[in-house]
Regions:
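Paired small-residue
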Residues: 87, 98-106
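Helix-loop boundary and gating motifs at the non-cytosolic
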Residues: 6-39, 45-46
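Helix-breaking motifs and short loop linkers at transmembrane-helix boundaries and internal kinks
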Residues: 40, 72, 93-98
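Structural signature of the two symmetry-related core transmembrane helices
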Residues: 75-89
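Glycine-rich segments within core transmembrane alpha-helices of 12-TM secondary carriers
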Residues: 136-146
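Residue-level signature of mid-helix packing/kink "hotspots" within the transmembrane helices
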Residues: 54-62, 146
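Helix-to-loop junctions at the C-terminal end of transmembrane segments
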Residues: 60-72
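Intracellular juxtamembrane helix-capping segments at the cytosolic ends
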Residues: 113-126
Length: 146
């Protein structure tokens, strides 16, 4: 283990976390507009997309603990980031409100997995003497992404 906080691995994980949150929060103001204009969903019902996303993000939590114990953390993180990228790109192909809601469900699950796997990896690559500072820096990367 390195004896400093800012190792290359830690900086990469923080950058990935920053970009993850940026990609998600750039979609938030756009999705209701797309649902209303392109898919014909009433504006009053567009908030359901956020409820579904949030539920999916929280439901995956207990399963994440199992997956991280069984499989390598790095692969769980990479897979969830890959699914998140595919889901974000998939919004361009959506043709119905049902497909959009399913895509939000997939994106919520992958975001929940990516966020928690990222935290786990950040803790793994941080020296125990810098763990508190590492957690603060990692969480600030998420805050800046918002």
């Amino acid at each position: 283990m390195a004896t400093k906080l800012w190792t290359l691995h830690f900086m990469r994980i923080c950058l990935a976390n920053l970009l993850l949150f940026i990609s998600l929060y750039l979609l938030y103001p756009v999705l209701p507009v797309v649902m209303a204009s392109r898919l014909g969903v009433p504006v009053s019902q567009t908030g359901g997309i956020y409820i579904l996303f949030t539920l999916a993000m929280f439901v995956i939590g207990p399963f994440h603990a199992y997956l991280v114990d069984v499989y390598k953390r790095k692969y769980i993180c990479m897979l969830s980031f890959g699914i998140m990228v595919a889901a974000t790109a998939g919004y361009t192909l959506v043709q119905s409100a049902t497909h959009l809601l399913l895509l939000c469900l997939v994106q919520g699950i992958s975001f929940g997995m990516a966020a928690t796997a990222g935290i786990t990896l950040a803790i793994d690559v941080t020296n125990s003497t810098f763990r508190s500072a590492g957690n603060v820096v990692f969480s600030w990367a998420a805050r800046l992404g918002m």
